[in-house]
Structure formats: C-alpha cells, structure tokens
C-alpha cells in the first residue's frame, strides 16, 4: 500500500474513534448537561433523546451546505479543508461538555456537521489521488478497516475509560473532541499528491 494509505489511516483512527463516542454518549451527555437527568426512563432523558434527533438533522444540513464550499475548493487545498473540518468537529464535541442550554447545542452540531462532510470526503479523495488505478478497488476496500477498527477499539477501551472519567458521558465527548483535534494535527503528515 502507498504511504498515504497509512498516513490517512492514522487520521482516520482519531476521527472514527471520536465519532463512536458521539453516537454512543450524546443523548446521555445532553440529558445530563441540559435536563440534569441520568435516568434513561425519565421524561428529561427522553426529551434529550428527541433533541439529539433534531441536532442530528441540523448536523447533516450543515454538512450539505458546507459541501458547496468544499466543491469549489482546489485539489491543492484538500489537506487544509480536511484539517479545518476536524478542528471544527473537535471544537463542536468539546463544546458539548461545557454547554448547558439546548439551543446553544445547535452551534456544536453545526461544527460537527462541517466535520462530518470533510471526514467522509477528503480521506477518500486524498487516497484515490495517491493510488494507481490498477489496485484502487482493493485499496479502497481495505481502507474501510480504517473506519471500522477505530470504532471497535473505542468501544473496547470505553470499558476502562468511562469509569476512569467518572462515568461521565459529557467527559467522554470531551475526550472525543480531543481525539478529533489529534486527527486534525495528523493531517499535516499526509503526503498529498497535489502539494
């Protein structure tokens, strides 16, 4: 595999590790921070779950809108936009830890939406530019492990991390944001073809 395969996979590890925690802990974090509840059977927890559904929709609307920005970018800017999106995603995840107002969470999920677009487009674009056409199908198939493996690792280590962080779902999202920022830093080490 070309070196870019491995370089991008390092970035992917941090990103998908973080995203696993977004999916796993968002409802509980929102319930704790905004509704001050931790009991999943409570009305507040259900309201938090419903609000997370609205925020998830906002996240994807943000992704679609930001797609128009990315579409106008030059190939030489791919690494910049990749890192930019990951920084925004990291800030969005970290902000959930600090926000206690449901409406302010819209800001967090707009940023996470920008991240969502970049982490689902830029890695594949950077990889396909780095590989020859002869083996591209095989490499792209193998590249999917850089999405699955980090989520498996995140799930396994959560059995130790969650108690270590005081069984705090907001703290797990804070950790996810830090992982996303580490991914943004790792983009610097990708040897992109258009540079």
Q: Can you name each region flagged by the protein language model?
A:
Residues 5-22, 110:
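Pair of pore-lining "gating" transmembrane helices in MFS-fold secondary transporters
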Residues 36-60:
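Loop-to-transmembrane helix entry
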Residues 65-78, 162:
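Helix-to-loop junctions at the C-terminal end of transmembrane segments
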Residues 88-100:
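C-terminal ends and interior cores of transmembrane alpha-helices
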Residues 118-132:
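Intracellular juxtamembrane helix-capping segments at the cytosolic ends
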Residues 133-165:
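A late C-terminal transmembrane helix in Major Facilitator Superfamily
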Residues 160-180:
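A membrane-interface helix-boundary motif in multi-pass transporters
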Residues 174-195:
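Multi-pass alpha-helical transporter architecture, strongest
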